[in-house]
Amino acid sequence: MSVSTNLKGLAELGLKPSEVFHNLSYEEIYQHELNNKEGVTSDNGTMMVDTGIFTGRSPKDKYFVDEPSSQNNIWWGPVNTKVSEAIFNELYAEVTKFLDNKKLYVFDGHAGTNDDTRISLRVVTERAWQHHFCTNMFLRPTKEELAKLDPEFTIINASGYKNPKYKEHGLNSEVFVIFHLAKKICIIGGTEYGGEMKKGIFSVMNYYLPLKNVLTMHCSANVGKDGDSALFFGLSGTGKTTLSTDPNRKLIGDDEHGWDDNGIFNIEGGCYAKTINLDPKTEPEIYAAIRRDALLENVVYDATTKKVDYSSAAKTENTRVSYPIFHIDNIQPGSKAGHPNTVIFLTYDAYGVLPAVSKLSIEQAMYHFLSGYTAKVAGTERGVKEPQATFSACFGQAFMTLHPTYYAKLLGEKMKKHQVNAYLINTGLVGGKYGVGKRMNLPATRQIINEILNGNIEKSEFEKHPVFQVSFPKSVNGVDAHILNPRNAWENKEDYDKTAADLAKQFVENYKKYLTGSKEFDYSQYGPIA
């Protein structure tokens, strides 16, 4: 449905479109995508799009305007780079000029399912599939809400505009994602990747909410039949979406949550799942969610049958699907729950030295939250691929707008107050490092999580790891005991000891950044021994 180009607020943004399409229905979006030749439908009717050169976020192209209202709060550094007001103004003028007389799609909605702390938002895009992405991922307003919705924060996405003066501006590339927190505006140029809008709003929520004493978290969440909720923290690819989507528990959300005085709540209205090697046997709920109204990104498909090949990474390893949360059958109404009983940190340990599951004290949980360890396998296709440790504070450093200790303090206070249990789960390798070790079996990890959530794991006898200082169970119902003690799973015990010591050193080295000045966050004694 086309609406007047005078849609409230557009002129104030400096936008002069030829046509405006506002909060389209899924059927309308589908027709626009086809008419604009933006995508192809798969054999089961799911829209498939290609996001162009960028198949992932561009973290080095993310900036915040250095302005008085926010400059003393922002965690400046490699994650949040300063840009001047003058450069923002210049690029803002270029972006609005670029969108002049174009057909625009406008999504108005919300972020945050808690009425007290949600923000109303507007996303302006030039492509129908980006409008589709927003409709899937943000909270869709009712007709009544839409009629009176006054956006507090706006994203203007001119993905087709590239900044030709980036060198003169001292920026990283012709791509930019710039936030002006005083004006409550974000402008995007040069990248079509949908995740920039999703994580852009998350970065904004990570600024405003903690300042109101509400913890924002890069985690998934679900709730059991008795109202017992659990949080799953982890970096991309560690299993947040997969492990929180559980047929026996209701899904609250798969990636972004808040925790306030009433409990936990989802920030989003949809899920954004990785689809590489998606298997209907091990991930039936996600597989079933991929249907009409879902949106597949950068997948490879058969040109004739349009059947998707989920095993192919020909375009990217980061193949994705976004879908509205109601595509999952077993969801928590309202996407919120009471205070969590359990916090689980997920790590993909490519060194294969961490236990399959470890119980953490609150102090150990603080250490591991600030460390945010996972490991990825770097390198080219030729030659040896060695694991590379990645330390991403709060298991989501790229989206943290305030200093990591700000979130850690809130997490520690809430965990103590509500007596929350914490566990560290290795979804990575067992029996050796990359090249030798095998990926932790998904059914085994699910069984470990079931035993944590039903409380049975507490009955186990625990052993303290001599290097990592965490406690791991000697047995877990339904799980092969040899994977529980990581050293036992290695053929060469000396190799294990050396690899564990190497990783411990990296933990210690990384944590030094929290040891300067105040000792408030010195949890180093609860971390690995190097």
Swiss-Prot record:
Q: Where does the record say this protein resides?
A: Cytoplasm
Q: Name one GO biological process term.
A: gluconeogenesis
Q: Which Gene3D superfamilies match?
A: 3.90.228.20, Phosphoenolpyruvate Carboxykinase, domain 1, Phosphoenolpyruvate Carboxykinase, domain 2
- Per the record, what are the reactions this protein catalyses? oxaloacetate + ATP = phosphoenolpyruvate + ADP + CO2
Q: List the disulfide bonds.
A: none
The prosthetic group or cofactor this protein requires is:
Mn(2+)
Which SUPFAM superfamilies does the protein's record reference? PEP carboxykinase N-terminal domain (SSF68923), PEP carboxykinase-like (SSF53795)
Query: Which EC class is the enzyme in?
Result: lyase
- Co-factor note (free text): Binds 1 Mn(2+) ion per subunit.
The source's domain of life comes to Bacteria
Pathway membership = Carbohydrate biosynthesis; gluconeogenesis
| UniProt xrefs under InterPro entries | PEP_carboxykinase_ATP, PEP_carboxykinase_C, PEP_carboxykinase_N, PEPCK_ATP_CS
Which Enzyme Commission number(s) are on file for it? Answer: 4.1.1.49
Q: Does the keyword Thylakoid apply?
A: no
> Which NCBIfam families did the record assign?
pckA, PRK09344.1-1, PRK09344.1-2, PRK09344.1-3
Q: What does this protein do?
A: Involved in the gluconeogenesis. Catalyzes the conversion of oxaloacetate (OAA) to phosphoenolpyruvate (PEP) through direct phosphoryl transfer between the nucleoside triphosphate and OAA.
Name this polypeptide is given: Phosphoenolpyruvate carboxykinase (ATP)
Annotated gene: pckA
